[in-house]
Amino acid sequence: MTWLPEWRVTVGDDVYTTVTSVSFASGRLDIDRQATAGYCQVEIINTDGSAFTINVTEPITLELKNSSGTYVTVFGGEVSDFNIGVRSPEESGYITTGKILGIGSLAKLTKVVYNTALAEGLDGAQISAILGNALNLTWAEVTPTVTWATYPADVTWANAESYIGTIDSGFYTMINLAASATAKSQTLADQIATSALGQIYEEKDGDVSYDDADHRSNYLATNGFTNLDGSYATPSSIQSTTQTARIRNSLIYRYGASYGSTYSTSDSDSIASYGLFERSFDSNIKNLADITDIASRELNLRKNPRGSLGAITFRLDNPDIPSAMLDSLIGVFFGQPVLINNLPSNLLGGSFDGFVENIALRATPSFVEITLYISATDFSLSTTQWETVTPASLIWTGVNGTLTWTNASGALT
């Protein structure tokens, strides 16, 4: 099919469709770290000399039409920088351009200190407290030009200036933390999320959400993988990488109150084969049983070197790409399970399944490419707790008769 990008950029109350270039990125490039603030760069054309009414700190939303002509939101944030330039003089006057730099809501966490004590509780509850403090704005923090008349009719005072999406309840019990006058919200939230095997990230509309440890397992069991045909990928973007830097065969965890307890584990066979690759961690996990499970999982995943796909790039303007796949790529989101098939047979066995960790896009009026960074599936699967899943959609049938609940990660149907 023939498809060319049609953009709709909304800044505050203003809508722009004369877009000449777009780029954005959101997510993380390292599964050992939490996502960082996304960004977008947009250039729009002004041919009539009218005044630009774009202000810094105003919300910005990028939408892209899919194959059926429906606009799909692909990025949300707020304006950080705005620049007006001249493209070329015309007989009727100058043609000017507006260049917008937008940043994601996670950037707000770097600017806010969380100076309140955190009680012992599930990771989701602690994350909710930190995000609520940083991302629920007061009226004094709202862009000065904004009035109540600009809000949709269904918006209430309680949620008018909230940048919080969905926060899972949590999977692990975390230690309590004393109040600190210097605790950065981002550092604190990242430490809790990483300790609990969760992910903090930006939704496509700009809100910040938190997925706890079994979120991806449950989503995969309910929805399965989205299939993407690797034969439509840019060939030079496809590569498998195996690194010694990813090996971990000796682990030391400092956990519990004030990180005063220590748990260690190692794999002698891996050490004999590859040498010692030791890592130590400060974990906010409270209980020994939990830290034991986390350490065992990490050791099993990392004790042997393994190939990984990493990033893969697709041209959305490829006339041969099927409409369904085009729409899947436009709608792709952080944490989505995908299966890349039709890869070379001598590269990862010809297919790779995993979860989307980062999305980056570059576009001109005639060119669009999207690059996905994908982590292997088993790095995101965890031991499922029955109380955190939906019994109506997950049933204990169709599995091997010898399978126990303890080992049922990813096996439910």
Regions from the language model: what does each represent?
Residues M1-Y16, A119-G121, A125, T187-D353, ...:
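Acidic, small/polar-enriched beta strand-loop surface segments
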Residues G38-C40, T173, G310:
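Short amphipathic alpha-helical segments
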Residues V42, I192, V356:
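Terminal peptide-recognition signature
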Residues S68-Y71, S88-T242:
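Charged- and aromatic-enriched interaction segments used to assemble
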